[in-house]
A protein has these predicted regions:
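Conserved catalytic cores of phosphodiester-cleaving nucleases, focusing on short active-site segments
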Residues: 4, 23-40
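Acidic-basic catalytic patches of nuclease active cores, encompassing PD-(D/E)XK
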Residues: 1-14
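Alpha-helix C-cap/termination motif
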Residues: 7, 26, 57-58
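Short coil/turn segments at beta-strand junctions that form active-site/ligand-binding loops
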Residues: 9, 30, 60
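Short acidic/glycine-enriched loop/turn segments that link adjacent beta-strands
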Residues: 17-20
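Nucleic-acid-binding surface
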Residues: 2, 39-49
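Domain-level recognition of nuclease-like catalytic cores that cleave nucleotide substrates
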Residues: 48, 52-86
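Structural signal for conserved beta-strand scaffold positions within catalytic alpha/beta enzyme cores
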Residues: 13, 35, 64-66
């Protein structure tokens, strides 16, 4: 979350998240939903499907951030918001 805030995003962690969205972030009218994984943990098919549903229902970008260690983060976009919709 610190990296988001350092780049001008408003960000909040979902308390004790056991759902698809761990972090909600917003900046300049854009919304980003993030599922966070670390180590060997992987997002399940069901978690990915739910994260995508969240992205679609809120017209938000949805990503999985996988912390690999030593500060390395692999980011994978699973849904892209439709820009200029409406």
């Amino acid at each position: 979350m610190n990296s988001l805030r350092e780049n001008g995003w408003m960000a909040s962690r979902s308390a004790a998240s056991h759902g698809a969205v761990d972090v909600f972030a917003a900046k300049d009218g854009k919304v980003l939903l993030i599922q966070v994984k670390s180590g060997r943990a992987r997002a399940t098919k069901e978690e990915l499907e739910e994260l995508i549903r969240w992205g679609k229902s809120s017209n938000a970008d949805a990503e999985v951030w996988h912390y690999k260690g030593r500060g390395k983060v692999v980011k994978r976009r699973v849904h892209a918001a439709k820009r200029g919709a409406g």
